[in-house]
């Protein structure tokens, strides 16, 4: 009798641990896909903002590749994936360092204070901040999580 109860407890523990593993996998996949969806939304906003760079050094460069996702990693009891604007310090010829300014804008700059010669300012396009604000993470996460869990049940 005692042996039968131990066997039932052990199988129940194994079942719960397998469910936890599978739900963690599903959560990891859902976080990853949500990160990709957010990145793609920010890239679409950047393309539609009408930003053109005419500098000869940056002619072939694609600014959209400066909006990137990081790897999925564990943070405490959950998973995390960063979506960010990259500044490429290795390749000085890529225009990615401009993305932060294009997103948030700059104040008007002056060359010399005595003559008040204006160099200009960059108007904020807010392609990244609008993507983050409009992205409905909870809905997307629940939708993807339900799909992944339904695949596991089959």
Predicted features and spans:
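Short, Lys/Arg-rich flexible segments
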Residues: 1-93, 104-154
């Amino acid at each position: 009798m005692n042996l039968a109860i131990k066997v039932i407890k052990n199988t129940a523990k194994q079942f719960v641990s397998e469910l936890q593993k599978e739900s963690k996998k599903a959560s990891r996949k859902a976080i990853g896909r949500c990160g990709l969806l957010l990145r793609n939304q920010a890239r679409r906003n950047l393309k539609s903002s009408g930003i053109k760079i005419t500098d000869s050094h940056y002619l072939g460069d694609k600014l959209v590749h400066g909006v990137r996702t990081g790897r999925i990693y564990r943070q405490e009891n959950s998973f995390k994936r960063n979506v960010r604007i990259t500044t490429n310090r290795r390749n000085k010829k890529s225009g990615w360092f401009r993305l932060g300014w294009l997103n948030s804008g700059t104040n008007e700059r002056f060359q010399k204070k005595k003559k008040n010669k204006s160099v200009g300012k960059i108007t904020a396009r807010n392609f990244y901040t609008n993507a983050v604000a409009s992205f409905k993470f909870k809905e997307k996460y629940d939708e993807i999580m339900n799909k992944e869990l339904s695949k596991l049940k089959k």
